[in-house]
Amino acid sequence: GMNVILTEETDWIGGQVSQQGVPPDEHKWIESGGATASYRMYRNKIRDFYRYHYHLTEAARNNPYLNPGNGGVSKICHEPMVSVEVLMEMLMPYVSAGKLQILLNHKAQSSDVQGDEVLAVTVRDRQNGELVTLTAPYFVDATECGDLLPLTKTEYVTGSESQEDTKELHAAKQSNPLNNQAFTVCFAMEYIPGEDWTIDKPDNYTFWANYIPNLTPAWPGKLLSMTYPTPSTLKPNHAVCIPDGTPTDAFNFWMYRRIIDQHNFLPDTYQGSTTLVNWPQNDYMLGNIICLLYTSDAADEA
């Protein structure tokens, strides 16, 4: 096989299931088909990690389809740090054999390009500032925002293309390079019954409390409310956030991406359950984060 250098700008490898903090979005047949062998191995190892290292109830431990968080978005909602441990374990044989070198906290800075060939990419150690130049027969970009595309002056397209560009019947008349999906910074939130963890009002509280996205078709009210447009129809949908899981006809955001269901664990293991917040309410719509990432503080604001 090949010798590979894997760079990662944070201290966690992974992506969606790790530093992005998002449980995997999976199809409903995932337990029986529609997955590669390596992905199925990854899923099995996630469950085994909880069985080996966590104080599960007997029912949870014996459940072949253990879902640590019992979240609705995936049949295997779990903590991002568990994914990091499992992914590192899966890569360890290649690291041990000298076939894979992992450079954490390294971010691409510049490139050496001749014609259409990328000869080298220089990365910077974010901890000590040291520059390392990597040479290879080819480079694969798996960054969040396609960092290597502008650095290597590779042709690329952002936003939406026009009917003239693609000949698609339902494409827009005009292309819009800034028409990208909203950017979201996810975070975990724990609910402990009887406790109050209200903080002081943060900066820009009043602005965000009253902010209505300026979109066409119109957003159905304030962003920070429990009403949001249904993605498939854009009709207003009214949700709730009920941490104890009380049955309701409304969509319960708390259950959507819950990564720890305390009832899967022995009593007193957790004081409460934990959910991952990746909801319409924390979408950032005031700038094109892809284009602004290197030139503005908008990423920090988002």
Kindly label every feature range from the protein language model.
Residues 3-8:
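Short beta-strand "acidic-cap" motif of Rossmann-like dinucleotide-binding folds
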Residues 9, 15-22, 113-114, 134, ...:
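Short, solvent-exposed loop/turn and secondary-structure capping segments
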Residues 9-106, 110, 181-187:
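Conserved N-terminal/central alpha/beta ligand/cofactor-binding core
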Residues 121-125:
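Short beta-strand segments that buttress and anchor functional surface loops
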Residues 129-138:
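Core beta-strand elements of the Rossmann-like FAD/NAD(P) dinucleotide-binding domain
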Residues 141-197:
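Glycine-rich loop(s) and the adjacent beta-strand/alpha-helix scaffold that form part
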Residues 174-274:
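Long, well-ordered, tryptophan-enriched scaffold segments
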Residues 294-302:
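Single conserved hydrophobic/aromatic residue that forms the stacking wall/gate
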